[in-house]
């Protein structure tokens, strides 16, 4: 019971790690890898897993309190409503295509953001840099 309370506020809760097969990508290329979920001290319900490929760039508005903006290029949703048991480790392969995109700037790299939406708890996150060829 106490473990459920701790995991609901993010202590010893589910963790996520995303590993990409290649750190380099070209436009019209595909991006693939493995997402691994590590169960915490209690079973948790994952509402969904979302992968987003984004470009980050400096905000041109100098008066803004938000110094960095994101341009979301592509999103992939994996799984809906799965249970991850206590201390369970589960891996899932993913692959999605990067269509011809219009960048806001001329970035050297993109960010692959992984967000695991966890019911009644703090969500789990991971970020990886993907360099452009």
Regions found by a protein language model. Give the residues of each.
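N-terminal onset of structured domains
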Residues: 1-75, 82-133
